[in-house]
Amino acid sequence: MKSFLLSRQAIHRISLLSSKTPTFCRNFSAITSTISHSDRHLRSYDEQTPFQNVEIPRPISSFNRYFHFTRESRLSESSAAIDDSNDQEEDDEDGTTNEFLSRFVWIMRGKVSEAYPDCDKKMIDGMLLLIVEKVVEEIERGGFNKVGSAPPSPSSEFSDDLWATIWEVSNTVLKDMEKERKKEKMKQYVQSPEVMEMCRFAGEIGIRGDLLRELRFKWAREKMDDAEFYESLEQQRDLDNSIRESETVDGEVEEEGFVPSDEVESRSISLPKRKGKLKYKIYGLELSDPKWVEMADKIHEAEEEADWREPKPVTGKCKLVMEKLESLQEGDDPSGLLAEWAELLEPNRVDWIALINQLREGNTHAYLKVRL
């Protein structure tokens, strides 16, 4: 971990934290409490950061939201409902981001403390502030998927080892959060009426103990997988509908901007001409050779000439003759029985093939003589 180094510019920024205003996003106020657990540090940080620049947003707590109503301006019920839904979405997003950053800081604090055992708590907090600032920038830029992937162009302020550790910790935190989400979702399906009904039936037929517990979680997991599958289908349908609506709007705009003319030129849409011959290769086999065309024609002709009819049923005297053929000895001549069999059955090609196959299974000597 000794290679886990900050550059000279980053160390300089840490030394200027007390006099220089850092740029944080709206979610960073929840992380300052995680980095420093004392109210004294928060008060000193607030005193040191006057927020004189209007463009820098001041950290806003979710408990300090006020709605101002006057006689002249009142929100309608519909707009209030929309605002409430937007606030709920923002709160959910803020909660997810805060949970991610809290877990990230907890793990990263241990790694930084291990890499710099001689640094005091204030210096460690300064390093964590710089690291979390970069992570928040990535979240604001591309979401959590951006954080979980490797950075396209690492910052010059951090070393390559530090960046690798940051993305490793981020992936670990995202995986843990996904496991927690699935675990909480699993609890809902374990207590669902369908799963409870199946467990009740299993208990009635004598299933108890660990087996019943395993079956209960198995049924809940299957139900959760089905629900996620149908949710993905719903999302795909909504996406397709939005694409169709956008295409319809674009088509209407084009029709509105279209100016009809007396002479309309007809245009033929065709694929561009390809130069040279097409080459088809399947598993390294060159199929563009003309011999494969001839072979395909022969196979097609053979399929047309093939007789796909079923053989005639062998009954009565014909069946007795067939039994005599199967009971022939090695020195017996089957020609007389074959002539009688052919006279009774009037066989086709399929019947002869069926006879040969039956003799091959029942009498090998007669099969060889008939085949010859």
Swiss-Prot record:
Which Cys residues form disulphide pairs?
Answer: none
User: GO terms for CC?
Assistant: mitochondrion; ribonucleoprotein complex; ribosome
The organism's taxonomic lineage, starting at the top: Eukaryota, Viridiplantae, Streptophyta, Embryophyta, Tracheophyta
Example of a GO biological process term: polar nucleus fusion
Q: Where is the protein situated, by its record's location annotation?
A: Mitochondrion
Asked whether the keyword Ribosomal protein is assigned, the reply is yes
Keyword list (alphabetical) reads:
Developmental protein, Karyogamy, Mitochondrion, Ribonucleoprotein, Ribosomal protein, Transit peptide
Q: What is this protein called?
A: Small ribosomal subunit protein mS77 (rPPR2)
- For the keyword Hydrolase, the answer is no
Q: How does it assemble?
A: Component of the mitochondrial ribosome small subunit.
Q: Where is the composition biased (Acidic residues)?
A: 248-257
What are the boundaries of the transit peptide?
A: 1-28
From which domain of life does this come? Eukaryota
Effect of deleting the gene: Failure of fusion of the polar nuclei during megagametogenesis.
Q: Where is this region: Disordered?
A: 240-265
Chief place where the protein resides: mitochondrion
Q: What does this protein do?
A: Required for karyogamy during female gametophyte development, when the two polar nuclei fuse to form the diploid central cell nucleus.
